[in-house]
Amino acid sequence: IQSIVQVAKNFGGVEHRIEFVREIDGVKWYNDSIATSPTRVIAGLNSFNQKLIVIAGGYDKKIPFEPLAEPVNKNVKILILLGATADKIEKAVTESPLYPESGLKIVRVKTLEEAVLTAQKMAEKGDVVTLSPACTSFDLYPNFEARGRHFKRLVNEL
């Protein structure tokens, strides 16, 4: 039992799955690049007990984004969108009856670099920023691991 307790204390989690990257000026940054579908993003959003800043978007694998509408409107304060699916995600979220009262801000960017810098500028002490794409990375990266590593490098260079 002692060894199980030790493993639990020292387990750092799985890379790219709600992986803590670092804290900068009171803002915590997480890499959830493996969240390549709305259901995985929703699971990630439910892991936090506050409204988040979320970076999302990527390759369009022709899946519906309507399941994101309610959880995003309830759990996200700033949604930073990029990639081929930005229009579809924004449409799904803004067509929700929850959107007008949610206070959600939506920002469009062209690159992950721009997304990270935008999140840094908009974040306040106590905020959480997470890369939770809801999409595969094939429009910009060979796989979710490459996207996640790039995100971590960008955050660590801030």
Question: What are the functions of these language-model segments?
Answer:
Residues D32-S33, G57-G58, L82, V107, ...:
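Glycine- and other small-residue-rich loops at beta-strand/loop junctions that grip anionic moieties
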Residues T130-A134:
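Short beta-strands and strand-loop turn motifs
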Residues K121, H150-L158:
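Phosphate-binding loop of NTP-binding sites
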